[in-house]
Swiss-Prot record:
Gene responsible for this protein: purL
HAMAP family: PurL_1 (MF_00419)
Biological function: Phosphoribosylformylglycinamidine synthase involved in the purines biosynthetic pathway. Catalyzes the ATP-dependent conversion of formylglycinamide ribonucleotide (FGAR) and glutamine to yield formylglycinamidine ribonucleotide (FGAM) and glutamate.
Annotated catalytic residues: 1182 (nucleophile), 1310, 1312
Entry keyword Transmembrane helix: no
UniProt GO BP: 'de novo' IMP biosynthetic process; purine nucleotide biosynthetic process
Catalysed reaction, written as an equation: N(2)-formyl-N(1)-(5-phospho-beta-D-ribosyl)glycinamide + L-glutamine + ATP + H2O = 2-formamido-N(1)-(5-O-phospho-beta-D-ribosyl)acetamidine + L-glutamate + ADP + phosphate + H(+)
Primary location class: cytoplasm
Leading EC class: ligase
UniProt protein name: Phosphoribosylformylglycinamidine synthase
Pathway(s): Purine metabolism; IMP biosynthesis via de novo pathway; 5-amino-1-(5-phospho-D-ribosyl)imidazole from N(2)-formyl-N(1)-(5-phospho-D-ribosyl)glycinamide: step 1/2
Record localization: Cytoplasm
Residues annotated as binding Mg(2+): 743, 747, 911
Length: 1355
């Protein structure tokens, strides 16, 4: 094989180079003068085939930047060392390891195949750095440089340009362990060598199995298999174990305690504790589904009973070792858990959580962080985990097409009064998912003899080796290399294709077909061995090793069988359905393999091509119900001290004391803004998100509850919320559990739900449970959670545990300390939502004292306990007082709020949690961009000591704050009194308090707090906003272009001045009503081809928008067009190019998609003909917009390639998820007719949305001919290049392009995710009144109605 090199510069941006140089200086004291970079594309093709001129031209177009041909070179590097100073210059090249094909190569070769370059079978991209240093770099310094620029698991140093991908590695032979001869000693040896995590009971059990029962030696493959399948991670020994608590045998296991909540409150439950997700009854739902799953076809309306599903899990150990990869595969694994429920289910949205140790942000002092703490070398530091784990999870969800709609994060590291250091060195990476399923597919069917075992998804790689057993160990107990080997690597685009075939099978039944899936399980811990045994249990199967698709020819049998390579499911189907599944998979371009058959002999047998059987295990022996293990749990007396304020704060005035406390608390990660997390993750894809993290005119990240819709046609849906209060556990595990459940419910209660009894929960436990004093705390928490839930009438129906939450860290004296993470319980609720438009959000909405009242619901009954609060944490304390427990009051409050929500008597509402009452009020004020005047009663004679005021304002007892209209005050108070909810009137929204004497002449709203008429706090909103945003801002500086981060902060502070100020939306037209007979009219309706490519994810919402406007939408893949299964012929009046990440954005956004059209003559002719017809239109959104530019459809034909406008990487250097303001300009665009002059909000999500043209004359032409009809504008409706109003940094505010005849329109933002009013995160009253309410289509439906009007005009 021949490898040819192609070069493109630069590989990384200027700001990334600056960041790299800064990190080298800060972390290793290495001074670098300059760094130049380039990519090297290593392209492999057969020796006997030299690329001809046409093939090379195609490849160059794909690999190069179209407008920068000078920055691309064939065979010749751009990087040269000088002849005079080579001592201080070095070229460093890093790239993928040769032994496996990367995700990049898989996508790149798929693109090549679509572009008639199937001769190319591999393309690997390396990065080359020309480093000029102040002095010659030592070997150690080069290693330190390498640490910062590559992933040592998947990449390596290239000392010279590579000549071959062949490594010469031969797969390791199967080894047999001499258990028959040596007994237990042989197993002990392999246990240590392979990191299998066998304990004493395991060793005895498996020695007996092989020595006495099977009477043979196990292979290393079998040992590895058993080690993964029977680890704590997989078997949950602790939750299933016998517990001796303080010397007394508990009559229930932890699982029995947890499951008893469901036994007591089974209402609405369909699947619980028995599948990959849990499920509850949902609603009968109208859906829009393609008629066929194996060929292009029209979308048709259908109905199904649609239960709601939820799953939640953690990926803590892998995230601690490799944060980005651990979090992305945690997300991917949870996604597969979601769709592998029953006989296949439907993914909708995700939830996330991150808990890390002290951040230690360079240059940003947080006074409670201990700078003397040391961290282990084999794990990432907390700051890196916080940033990179969230990057990994976000990136995977963005590419997959799953929105993240709610979450949490916290940082903790402290020394307790007993001298023990507690910190999340081993982090929490939490991932939850909510979705739906077809009720007909609730139960997996049992295997039958002759059924076919299928592996669907990505090929086998040497990644994720031993993740199950490694996750079951304390961090530091395993060899570092084994730790790193246990981390997986994700491929979101492959995961999305896998999800599509599961969805295709699920949806095949809607229009009269048959779901071929008998059973489905996702591949996770234990790899193929675990999932294949699981799916054929108890009948057994013969599995053929050589049928399992491998991406690495050097893999051994053990690695193919045991590695957790991602994006893989095991399916069980009947033999007669093989052809159907194959057709579905070919259409979606997903690899599948029919790897074996169910036998009925009860044995899982793995057979090599040579006839060897490295696995030959009787399932009843290895998957049997094992004898429970026994755990001894004893309470350890807590050493607690009451919370005290520093003396210097006690002697000053109350305001000084309060200001210092608040300044600290607002900078705590769990309390302050989470903007650094939410702006980089998609929160609207699918078009089914009714409520996500951001609210109010400034799109502020303050949420109670997340809500999704059942579909596009009605108002039913599902709500989910999260509760977690781990720091309270240092005082009392029971209090922690009570507050966790309470927080989950006081977050949930703002959505309109069917019934409290319908609420079901996932319980996730992250604890160092097997260490002294910890298991009993978990036990106490479980008992309290049980009691509270039973009394409330809710229940747990699923969850996961991670019980090795500790890590070894070095001490200054050279010894090690074992650092336990705080014990954590995360409760995720989910419940049917009867009206998604009624959800109450925290942002204040009323205008003045005259029309507003603020109510305070204190479920702590004025006790104001502060133990384990944010306040105690920021003074390096814990406290000793427990919160007030009152479950009946919690239940009554929930019921009262539900009644008020359904009667629409609350304008804004928010729970009390981290940071206390003052934080609740601040978040309501900032999110509404409105002032507040609060006057709390002084019930504790606060003149004597500021501590009582501090406790009043910072206590984290359960509670809530409501904003209501003054005209509704009496009816609201009556309802609250009816439910015996203690309520106080504490103030008013105050948008006109700028006349207050204390404002120093400012025109800003003020946030004012008094206690007993005594002024405690008086601050301008912009100053308050700066404090609340500060830590998020510091984190943002480390993950995006600092210039743009600073711009956002500057603009935010300009905007956060009160009076409800925000975008000035203006709608200049009325929209036509939606027909009630869309389904009946479909056959006569104009036809639009909704075209998607591999990796697209915006097709369903696009089809729905066109359907609502009266079109018959067709589901058309590029595979359909390339295979000639459908023509873009006269029947189609429109084409819609959808959003997403075609080919995972490999070779630049939409480049591969454009190439598959451009370089296929037959398809290219069809598109040219369609474009040339005068009776057609096209609409490209996001990825589709990028495609239309690359095809030259906009702004007009005939532009030279190097001058053709493009949409390139955002100037901020990252994916941007924003709710932006746009103005619709006068233009030829037919689809925007009548909308001119309107200023509207719209979802915008992209990583490459910056308009770019090298030719200023073309830019001038676009402006002169009004060919950019949608432009980014600021709050005043003025065209802007200012970030984040303009999220991509695009010149002239260009957010769109259209053709000169107006028939072809390309838009970067997402009107198809904004065409229904409930999809808008913020809709001001003037727009709401214009469209007729949140249950109506939004102003953006006009685009699609205009397309229909154009088609109608042709007749």
């Amino acid at each position: 094989m021949t490898i040819q090199q192609f070069y493109r510069k630069p590989a990384i941006s200027e700001y990334e180079i600056k960041l790299l140089k800064n990190n080298l200086k800060k972390q290793h004291n290495i001074d670098i003068e300059s760094i130049e970079t380039e990519y090297c594309f290593n392209v492999q093709y057969p020796d006997n085939h030299k690329l001809n001129e046409s093939e090379q031209s195609t490849l160059v177009w794909l690999l190069s930047e179209t407008f920068e041909p000078k920055n691309f070179s064939i065979d010749k590097s751009f990087l040269k060392t000088t002849t005079t100073t080579t001592e201080n210059e070095i070229i460093i090249e890093v790239g993928p390891r040769m032994n496996f094909t990367t995700t990049y190569s898989s996508n790149a070769t798929s693109i090549c195949k679509s572009c008639n370059l199937s001769i190319i079978d591999r393309i690997e991209r390396s990065r080359r750095y020309l480093v000029k240093s102040v002095s010659k770099l030592s070997e150690k310094q080069i290693d330190q440089f390498l640490e910062l620029i590559h992933d040592r698991m998947t990449e390596c140093l290239y000392p010279t340009p590579i000549k071959s991908f062949d490594t010469g590695i031969i797969p390791k032979a199967v080894v047999y362990i001499p258990v028959v001869e040596e007994g237990r000693a042989a197993l002990e040896r392999v246990n240590k060598e392979m990191g299998l995590a066998f304990d004493e009971q395991d060793l005895a059990l498996y020695t007996d199995l092989f020595q006495n029962q099977l009477k043979r030696n196990p292979s290393d493959v079998e040992c590895f298999d058993i080690g993964q399948s029977n680890s704590e991670h997989s078997r949950h020994w602790f939750f299933n174990g016998k517990l001796i608590v303080d010397g007394n045998m508990s009559d229930k296991t932890l699982f029995q305690i947890v499951k008893n909540t469901l036994k007591a409150n089974p209402q609405n439950s369909l699947i619980a504790f028995s599948d990959n997700s849990s499920s509850i009854k949902g609603f009968k739902t109208k859906v829009l589904i393609p008629k066929s799953q194996i060929e292009a076809s029209e979308y048709l309306e259908g109905e199904r009973e649609q239960p709601i599903i939820f799953t939640a899990e953690t990926h803590n150990f892998p995230t601690g070792i490799a944060p980005f990869e651990g979090a992305e595969t945690g997300t991917g694994g949870r996604l597969r858990d979601t769709h592998a429920t029953g006989r296949g289910s439907l993914v909708v949205a995700g939830t996330v959580g991150y808990c890390v140790g002290n951040l230690n942000i360079p240059g940003y002092e947080l006074p409670w962080e201990n700078k003397e703490y040391n961290y282990p070398d084999n794990m990432a530091n907390p700051l890196k985990i916080e940033i990179e784990a969230s990057n990994g999870a976000s990136d995977y969800g963005n590419k997959f097409g799953e929105p993240v709609i709610i979450g949490f994060t916290r940082s903790y590291g402290n020394t307790l009064p007993n001298g023990e250091r507690r910190e999340w060195i081993k982090p929490i990476m939490f991932s939850g998912g909510i979705g739906f399923m077809d009720e007909r597919h609730l139960k997996k069917e049992q295997p039958e003899i002759g059924m076919v075992v299928v592996k669907a998804g990505g090929p086998a790689y040497r990644i994720g080796m031993g993740g199950g057993s490694a996750s079951s160990m304390v961090g530091g107990d395993n060899k570092h290399e084994l730790d790193f080997s246990a981390v997986q690597r994700g491929d979101a685009e492959m995961g999305q294709k896998l999800n599509r075939i599961v969805r295709s099978c699920v949806e095949s039944e809607i229009h009269g077909g048959c779901n071929p899936i008998v059973s489905v399980h996702d591949q996770g811990a234990g790899g193929a061995g675990n999932v294949l045994k699981e799916i054929v249990d108890p009948l057994g199967a013969k599995i053929y090793l050589d049928r399992i698709i491998s991406g690495d020819p050097t893999l051994s049998a053990m690695e193919i069988w045991g590695a957790e390579y991602q994006e893989n499911d095991a399916l069980l189907i009947k033999a007669e359905h093989k052809d159907y599944l194959k057709k579905v998979s070919e259409r979606e371009r997903l690899p599948i393999a029919f790897v074996g058959d169910v036998t009925g002999d009860g044995i899982a047998q793995l057979i090599t091509k040579d006839g060897e059987t490295p696995v030959n295990l009787p399932l009843d022996k290895v998957l049997q119900k094992m004898p429970p293990k026994t755990f001894v749990l004893d309470h350890v007396e807590k050493q607690l001290k009451p919370f005290t304020l520093p003396k210097e704060l006690l002697v000053g005035d109350h305001q000084t004391c309060f200001n210092e406390c608040l300044n600290r608390v607002l900078r705590l990660l769990s309390v302050g803004s989470k903007r650094f997390l939410i702006n980089k993750v998609d929160r609207a894809v699918t078009g089914l998100v009714a409520r996500q993290q951001c609210v109010g005119p400034l799109h502020t990240p303050v949420s109670n509850v997340a809500v999704i819709s059942s579909g596009y046609f009605g108002k039913s849906g599902a709500a989910t919320s999260i509760g977690e209060q781990p720091i309270k556990g240092f005082i009392s595990a029971k209090s922690m559990a009570y507050l966790t459940v309470g927080e989950a419910l006081t977050n949930l209660m703002w959505a309109s739900i069917t019934d409290l009894g319908d609420v079901k929960c996932s319980g996730n436990w992250m604890w160092a449970a097997k260490l002294k004093g910890e298991g009993v705390e978990l036990y106490d928490a479980a008992i309290e959670m049980h009691d509270v839930m039973v009394e409330l009438g809710i229940a747990i129906d699923g969850g996961k545990d991670s019980l090795s939450m500790a890590a070894k860290a070095p001490k200054s004296d050279g010894s090690q300390e074992l650092v336990k993470a705080p014990g954590a319980l995360v409760v995720s609720t989910y419940v049917p939502c009867d009206d998604i438009t009624l959800t109450v959000t925290p942002d204040l909405k009323l205008s003045s004292k005259d029309d507003s009242v603020i109510l305070y619901l204190d479920l702590g009954c004025a006790n104001n306990f502060i133990g384990g609060s944010a306040l105690t944490q920021v003074f390096n304390q814990v406290g000793n007082d427990e919160p007030h427990h009152n479950t009946p009051l919690l239940k009554n409050t929930f019921m009262a709020i539900q009644k008020l929500v359904k009667q629409q008597l609350i304008s804004a509402g928010h729970d009390r949690s981290d940071g206390g009452l003052i934080t609740t009020l601040i978040e309501m004020s900032l999110s509404g961009n409105r002032g507040l005047e609060i006057n709390l009663p002084d019930t504790h004679n606060s003149d004597q000591s500021p501590l009582s005021i501090i406790k009043l304002l910072f206590s984290e007892e359960l509670g809530a704050v409501l904003e209501i209209k003054k005209s509704n005050q009496q009816i609201v108070l009556d309802i609250l009194k009816q439910f015996n909810v203690p309520t106080q009137v504490i103030g008013n929204t105050s948008c006109n308090n700028n006349n207050n004497n204390n404002n120093n002449g400012s025109d800003e709203d003020l946030f004012i707090v008094k206690v007993g008429d005594k002024l405690i706090y008086n601050i301008k909103l912009s100053q308050l906003s700066k404090q609340w945003e500060e830590t998020s801002y510091q984190l943002e500086l480390l993950q995006a272009n600092p210039t743009f981060v600073e711009s956002e902060m500057k603009n935010l502070l300009k905007r956060a001045t009160g009076k409800g100020k925000g975008p000035n939306y203006n709608m200049t037209y009325k929209i036509s009503p939606i027909s009630k007979e869309l389904a009946l009219l479909a056959n006569k309706a104009p036809k639009v081809a909704v075209i998607r490519e591999e990796g697209s994810n915006g097709d369903r919402e696009m089809a729905a928008a066109f359907h609502f406007a009266g079109f018959q939408a067709f589901d058309v893949t590029m595979s359909d067009l390339l295979n000639g299964n459908i023509q873009l012929d006269e029947r189609f009046k429109g084409v819609a190019f959808v959003g997403g990440f075609s080919y995972g954005d490999v070779m630049d956004s939409a480049k591969g998609w454009a190439g598959s059209i451009r370089f296929n003559q037959q398809v290219s002719k069809q598109f040219d003909h369609f474009y040339g017809r005068n009776d057609t239109f096209s609409l490209g959104l996001c990825n589709g917009c990028q495609l239309m530019a690359l095809l030259g459809w906009v702004p007009y034909r005939g532009i030279e390639q190097t001058h053709q406008p493009r949409f390139i990487h955002n100037a901020s250097g990252r994916f941007e998820s924003r709710w932006v303001n746009v103005k619709i300009m006068p233009s030829p665009a037919l689809l925007l007719k009548g909308m001119e002059g309107s200023v509207l909000g719209v979802w915008s999500q992209h990583g490459e949305g910056r308009f770019w043209s090298e030719d200023q004359s073309i830019v001038n032409d676009i402006k002169a001919n009004n060919l950019s009809p949608i432009r980014y504008v600021d709050d005043d409706g003025e065209i802007t290049e200012s970030y984040p109003f303009n999220p991509s940094g695009t010149q002239e505010g260009f957010a769109s392009l259209c053709s000169k005849d107006g028939r072809h329109l390309a838009i970067m933002p997402h009107p198809e995710r904004s065409f229904l009013s409930w999809q808008w995160p913020f809709m001001p009253e003037n727009i709401k009144q214009n469209v007729g309410g949140l249950d109506q289509p939004s102003p953006w439906i006009k685009i699609f109605q205009n397309a229909k009007s154009f088609c109608d005009s042709l007749n």
